[in-house]
Amino acid sequence: MLKTFATICIIGMFTSSCTSKKASRTEGSHEAEQELTMIVGTYTSGDSKGLYSFRFNEENGTATALSEAEVENPSYLVPSADGKFIYAVSEFSNEQAAANAFAFNKEEGTFRLLNMQKTGGEDPCYIITNGSNVVTANYSGGSISVFPIDKDGSLLPASEVVKFKGSGADKERQEKPHLHCVRITPD
């Protein structure tokens, strides 16, 4: 339960800071200028559906539910730079582990699943995009997976799965690599 709550809070904070402010519908509309679109990913072992969208008011701290999408364990997600797509992991410790692509309507807060691709590495716990590719860090798989993005925003099959090797001093916890994050540099 604590893990689910922490995931909701962390993803909500990151995605609300990564999405653009809703454009004012009328000049001088202060309330519309204070609203952000917030996307929340959850673990789905309980009653959760997976992905949720909210309209978040920065001024008074309220969130209004907009929509939901059923997807399993989207514990980490990232919006595309233009906000038209959401990419989310499905965190599993088996062959079900996947990256999902959704079309996203910011005005309505609605999701439409485009497709899902297997990561080839267990427990994807981080996802990032540079606009051309989506990359996952696969914690238990000790790997990263690279997915080219198709013209419609969907994900093509992994073009590469890079598996790391090695162990640490604590043989019980560090028997193999456990990736937490992958970042793309501008160079």
Where are the regions a protein language model picked out?
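Asp-box/WD-like beta-propeller blade repeats and closely related beta-sheet repeat scaffolds
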Residues: 109-181
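Short loop/turn segments that connect beta-strands within beta-propeller blades
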Residues: 57-59, 104-108, 150-152
